[in-house]
């Protein structure tokens, strides 16, 4: 055991010196520090250092050693805390990372993001092994090829829990998962270890913001921009200014914000933040099916997207005009009601119900803003939300429809992985334990010709069809004739203003 422990300690020290800001002078120091962390009070330099160069694989061996030495128990929490502490040795300090990032940025934004992204994968802040477990498949639809993900790397939240967390978050340290004080935080039960976490500091419109990657990425280079202050999500003029500024700083990234109201917002409403990345979403490729003009801003190209949700696209090479036009549409939408299609801006008590999910990107020399109209009204028929996944599709997805799904990438809950295996057995008429919530849907699917060769494809296509319905449910102005006329009435309100 002693030789085995020494072998992996020596291997990790080798990786630290090669990947971190340490030198040969630090070898004894590092050896003793690592040995202590894994519970070894003796070290014997191996004749040959293990050639394994993948940090995570070596750290997994060290975690096994630590558990055998009773340094940690068999809980996930203690293992993750020690893993993050070990990975911190190959992670430069915040000062050094920020300096290196800026040095690379002087060469190009791409070199800077490549450096930071690779570092966050190497030190396992980005959970590549967990992310690889996700089930991903494309699905053809009337709106192009949509993306479906069954998320096996991160637990799901329901809308009520999200709202409860918003109310409770002020009494915690860190105040929430996005606060900058997470950088280097050791973690605790029910709160993740962040010892190896780093944040790039940015100035956005004369405000201090941070840039980091998501540990549970849903797409390529899934990034987060976060306010240094812990303040609630708010869609306003400054939101559009910041989003467009980010696309100027990082022209290869899209960036968008979740809505700032419950039901139609994301999983964290208590801290202003945006999500970004190097990924082309299905909505990016959606065409404008009806163009219109804005009297005040004749240079802006504007139109309604061919998309199941209600989306206005604006394009221009002038950031300031785009910001002003977006603010005009936001203001109009916040105060717009149309009882004919159950669209109500305010409750009788003055509670606001309208907001926007905005997305910004670059298209060559043009800046592009997509403004997705959102409404979080509820009713007796739809207590979870009128423009929220309706009961008949909640066996697949009952959570909020946030920014990522708005753009055509479904993030479905982990429970489906096992439940769909039972649906598969049911369709093949094999012994099964199908969830009652899926039975009616499975009976519909069974009307097709089902074989062992095509059953997975049939189920996936069925999920894709439901995802389109989910987006349609979340759309304020429906895709039928009544909905189109209602959307045009709203457009008329902003065209001549």
Swiss-Prot record:
GO terms for cellular component: cytoplasm. One of its GO terms (molecular function) is UDP-glucose:hexose-1-phosphate uridylyltransferase activity. Pfam families: GalP_UDP_tr_C (PF02744), GalP_UDP_transf (PF01087). The gene is galT. Belongs to the galactose-1-phosphate uridylyltransferase type 2 family. It comes from Enterococcus faecalis (strain ATCC 700802 / V583). Pathway: Carbohydrate metabolism; galactose metabolism. It is an enzyme of class 2 (transferase). It is found in: Cytoplasm. Keywords: Carbohydrate metabolism, Cytoplasm, Galactose metabolism, Nucleotidyltransferase, Transferase. It catalyses: alpha-D-galactose 1-phosphate + UDP-alpha-D-glucose = alpha-D-glucose 1-phosphate + UDP-alpha-D-galactose. This is Galactose-1-phosphate uridylyltransferase.
């Amino acid at each position: 055991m002693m030789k085995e422990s020494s072998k992996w300690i020596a291997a990790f020290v080798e990786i630290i010196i090669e990947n971190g800001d340490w030198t040969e002078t630090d070898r004894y120091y590092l050896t003793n520090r690592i040995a202590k962390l894994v519970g070894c009070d003796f070290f014997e330099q191996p004749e040959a250092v293990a050639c394994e160069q993948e940090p995570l694989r070596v750290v997994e061996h060290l975690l096994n050693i630590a558990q055998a030495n009773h340094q940690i128990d068999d809980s996930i929490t203690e293992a993750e805390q020690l893993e993050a502490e070990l990975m911190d040795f190959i992670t430069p300090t915040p000062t050094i990372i920020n300096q290196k990032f800026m040095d690379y940025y002087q060469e190009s934004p791409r070199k800077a993001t490549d450096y930071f992204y690779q570092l966050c994968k190497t030190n396992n802040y980005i959970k590549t092994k967990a992310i690889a477990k996700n089930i991903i498949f494309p699905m053809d639809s009337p709106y192009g090829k949509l993306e479906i993900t069954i998320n096996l790397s991160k637990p799901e939240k329901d809308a009520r829990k999200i709202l409860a967390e918003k109310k409770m978050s002020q009494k915690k340290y860190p105040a929430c998962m996005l606060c900058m004080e997470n950088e280097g935080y050791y973690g605790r039960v029910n709160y993740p270890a962040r010892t190896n976490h780093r944040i790039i500091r940015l100035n956005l419109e004369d405000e201090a913001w941070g840039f980091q990657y998501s540990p549970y990425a849903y797409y390529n280079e899934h990034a987060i921009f976060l306010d240094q202050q812990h303040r609630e999500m708010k869609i306003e003029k400054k939101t559009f200014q910041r989003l467009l500024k980010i696309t100027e700083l990082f022209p290869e990234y899209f960036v968008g914000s979740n809505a700032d109201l419950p039901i139609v917002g994301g999983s964290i409403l208590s801290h202003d933040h945006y999500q970004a990345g190097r990924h082309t979403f299905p909505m990016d490729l959606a065409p404008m099916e009806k163009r219109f003009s804005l009297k005040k801003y004749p240079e802006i190209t504007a139109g309604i997207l061919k998309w199941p949700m209600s989306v206005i696209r604006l394009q221009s090479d002038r950031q300031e005009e785009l910001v002003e036009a977006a603010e005009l549409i936001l203001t109009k939408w916040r105060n717009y009601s149309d009882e004919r299609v159950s669209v109500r801006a305010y409750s009788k008590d003055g509670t606001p119900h309208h907001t926007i999910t905005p997305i910004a990107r670059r298209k060559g020399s043009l800046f592009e803003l997509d403004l997705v109209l959102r409404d979080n009204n509820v009713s007796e028929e739809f207590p979870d939300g009128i423009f929220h996944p309706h009961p008949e599709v909640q066996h697949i997805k009952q959570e909020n429809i946030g920014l990522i799904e708005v753009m055509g990438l479904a993030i479905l809950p982990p429970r489906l992985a096992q439940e769909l295996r039972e649906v598969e057995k049911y369709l093949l008429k094999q012994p099964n334990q199908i969830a009652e919530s899926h039975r009616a849907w499975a009976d519909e699917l069974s009307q097709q010709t089902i074989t062992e060769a095509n059953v997975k494809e049939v189920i996936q296509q069925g999920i894709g069809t439901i995802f389109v319905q989910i987006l349609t449910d979340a759309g304020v102005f429906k895709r039928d004739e009544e909905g189109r006329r209602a959307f045009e009435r709203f457009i008329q309100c902003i065209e001549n203003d």
